[in-house]
Amino acid sequence: PCWKGWSEDEQNLWPQRYIQLVVVADHGMFMKYNGDLAAIRKRVHELVNNINGFYRSLNIDVSLTDLEIWSDQDFITVVQSSSAKNTLNSFGEWREADLLRRKSHDHAQLLTAIDLDDDTVGLAYTSSMCNPRKSVAWGQDHSEEPINLLDVGVTMAHELGHNLGMNHDEEKKCHCGASLCIMSPSITEGPSLEFSDDSMGYYQSFLVVVNYNPQCILNKPEDQYYYILSPKHRIYSW
């Protein structure tokens, strides 16, 4: 069964949390946008702005800490023959061994232009926020039209939700004021902009369960933002 509905007053009492996000745009993204770094930066900023908007109802501030663009080559295997799970595993290993050593952050998402799986546009570990290897997800930039930017933003927010302890919503049992909610198993009727009562309950449980109790999202981030152009890791502040 789903959790009860959460009143606005109850939501206002939820603790403030901060997620410092790094987005890694793979080489496929670099090629898709014809090497236009400004276009990629604009795309990612708009996506993160959407994600942050979705999470305000949970009292979570999502900020873009870094954008890394793999302009010359991918640093993990990202090809159509790769399985979705293998890509997630490889990205998590790379994050732990490389990215975390260069930049402190809470969660990283790989944004790819490659169709890794006909039925999957994103994948993440569950209840893994703050884990060095598993606080990751990947999502496909599967929408060609700017007007459909929300589709990709919802995908990224959905995968982040898994890291925060959320499971998929049960069909016809969970409610968010729309026909589909962000944690619905699939997007069939257009993207939803809200989390269900069930997702909110899973998240609240994740915060208090001793085995999880993610500490990294307690810290308010600095305002400084960087993007990094691979492979020499040249750093530009904005």
UniProtKB/Swiss-Prot annotation:
Disulfide bonds join 130-216, 174-181. Binds 1 zinc ion per subunit. Its cofactor is Zn(2+). Inhibited by EDTA and EGTA. Inhibited by serum and antihemorrhagic factors Da2-I and Da2-II from D.albiventris. Not inhibited by PMSF or SBT-I. Snake venom zinc metalloprotease that is weakly hemorrhagic and has Aalpha, Bbeta fibrinogenolytic activities. Cleaves the Aalpha chain of fibrinogen first, followed by the Bbeta chain and shows no effect on the gamma chain. Has caseinolytic activity. Induces dose-dependent edema. Keywords: Calcium, Disulfide bond, Fibrinogenolytic toxin, Hemostasis impairing toxin, Hydrolase, Metal-binding, Metalloprotease, Protease, Secreted, Toxin, Zinc. One of its GO terms (molecular function) is metalloendopeptidase activity. Its EC number is 3.4.24.-. This is Snake venom metalloproteinase HF-1.
